[in-house]
Amino acid sequence: MNLEKVKSIQLLKLVLTGFYLVFVAFWIQSCTINPATGKKSISLNTMAEEEKIGRSEHPKILRAFGGEYQNLRLKNYIRTIGNKLANVSELPSINWKFTILNSKEVNAFAVPGGYIYVTRGLIALANNEAELAAVLAHEIGHITALHPSSRRATGTLTGIGVLASGIIFGRAGSEIGDLIGRYSMSRYSKSQEFEADLLGVRYLSRANYEPK
């Protein structure tokens, strides 16, 4: 390897390291106190941008789960419960959307922008309205705690880290960074699930459901 090429690689490493450090500083500055949790939360997007992300993901989710379950009475029922809970959350003014997915799978989840999904398979297992409300309240808790947003922010930061580690430390560094990135974005942490539980109980109580 000639001297000029070595210098070019060293310069590239310095540039990427500097970019990575600037991004980390920006990431830290993006931390704000979340009114729902009272803790610092990370979000690189405004609420309008969050809603745009959710709107973009919505058709993909519908395709992946067999579309929206077309039972108008049940749709209105779930929407009524969801809005009742969302209205007593720390984010009552965002445009919450509650969708029943036409899937036998037992699942419920949330994406940025106030998009909450519950499958007909899960609804079929619920014994009463309070149990459905508990599921929806938990997912609302993920949104108000900004868990989907912080996961995306962490994923963005990790992606930069994978790029930097690959160039600075070679293939091994890239593989390690990629492994960390996949793990960090694969699921909510136990602490996030517990936090969503606590917030869910708060919203159930405010909406006059008896948490169980």
Features from the language model and the residues they span:
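A Zn2+-metalloprotease active-site environment signal
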Residues: 2-20, 26-212
